[in-house]
Amino acid sequence: MSGFSSVAATKKVVQQLQLEAGLNSVKVSQAAADLKQFCLQNAQHDPLLTGVSSSTNPFRPQKVCSFL
């Protein structure tokens, strides 16, 4: 049994390595530059940077009912 499982495990490893060999690689510096560019281009749409208006914020404190 262990021989069969070893062959199966080796086949899995070979398949994974073949998959990884076919991927296009990008330098980390280029990926970081692309990510920075994306963040700068989309900063005006990021609610963590621009904030959320109080009228559309579902987590704002609820107002107290004045009838009570």
Swiss-Prot record:
Lipidation residue positions, type S-geranylgeranyl cysteine: C65
Q: Where in the cell is it found?
A: Cell membrane
The UniProt entry, under CDD domains, shows:
GGL
**Which UniProt key words apply to this protein?**
Cell membrane, Lipoprotein, Membrane, Methylation, Prenylation, Transducer
- Point out residues bearing the modification Cysteine methyl ester: C65
- Would you name any one GO CC term? heterotrimeric G-protein complex
Q: Which family does it belong to?
A: Belongs to the G protein gamma family.
Q: What does this protein do?
A: Guanine nucleotide-binding proteins (G proteins) are involved as a modulator or transducer in various transmembrane signaling systems. The beta and gamma chains are required for the GTPase activity, for replacement of GDP by GTP, and for G protein-effector interaction.
Q: How does it assemble?
A: G proteins are composed of 3 units; alpha, beta and gamma.
* PANTHER family given in the database record: GUANINE NUCLEOTIDE-BINDING PROTEIN GAMMA SUBUNIT
**Which protein, by its recorded name, is this?**
Guanine nucleotide-binding protein G(I)/G(S)/G(O) subunit gamma-5B
Which gene produces this protein? GNG5B
